[in-house]
Amino acid sequence: MLPPDLVIRSTRVVCRGVVAPACVHVSNGVIAALTAHHEAPAGVPSVDVGNAVILPGLVDTHVHVNEPGRTEWEGFQTATRAAAAGGVTTIVDMPLNSIPPVTDGKGLQMKIDAAGGQCWIDVGFWGGLVPGNILELRPLHEQGVLGFKCFLIPSGVDEFPCVTEAELRPAMAELSSLGAVLLAHAELPQANKNVPKLQPSMERQYSVYLQ
């Protein structure tokens, strides 16, 4: 075990589903060990946070960092600092809302370049599935995107159009061959065409929502 250069002590440390008093040993910025609450080595700087909870960093897989192109909405600097302040140590950025979107290798590289030197935490990227980019899926996968996102209704931004069922099926086959994850904004407008309109007095009933 590496000797720690910092020890953080708490009465509530979360590890493998158990909450217990412990000391967290940190060496060169990396957690090196957990020991009993009273086992803080002498001469090592320590911080006692009382009963504040120490837990592994959270991962948020649905984040919209709109840089480049719409940084006034959110950029890597603000998004990752806010995440760190809330205990989130990894985010995965959605492929739309930036300009260009992450629907090909060029868009991904522009994202990576925009993130350079601005991230306070770890950042991963989703790729986008849009009409006409099926040949971009494999290169994006090989470049390291963690999966793909598509919309089945308009996304709200013109540069990230939705796919039809006819476009979705061959893309799903391609992604299956890659072992890649596909996320779908899962509304199918045509499936709702014959749904009877609810009576106004019923629309807020929870039982109706469940149906």
Where are these regions (language model features)?
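Histidine-rich, glycine-flanked metal-binding segment
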Residues: M1-P56
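Residue-level signal for inorganic ion chemistry
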Residues: T11, G29, A83, G87, ...
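Metal-associated gating/positioning segment near the N- to mid-region
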Residues: A52-Q118
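Hydrophobic faces of well-ordered beta-strands that scaffold small-molecule active sites
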Residues: G57-V63, I91-V92, V123-G127, F148-C150, ...
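Short, acidic/polar
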Residues: E72-T80, P131-L140
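Active-site gating loops and adjacent loop-to-helix segments of metal-dependent hydrolytic enzymes
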Residues: A85-D104, D113-W120, F151-P154, P189-Q211
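Short, well-ordered coil/turn segments that N-cap beta-strands
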Residues: V88-T89, G117-G124, G144-L146, L178-A180
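Histidine/acidic residue-rich metal-binding segments in metalloenzymes
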Residues: L135-Q211
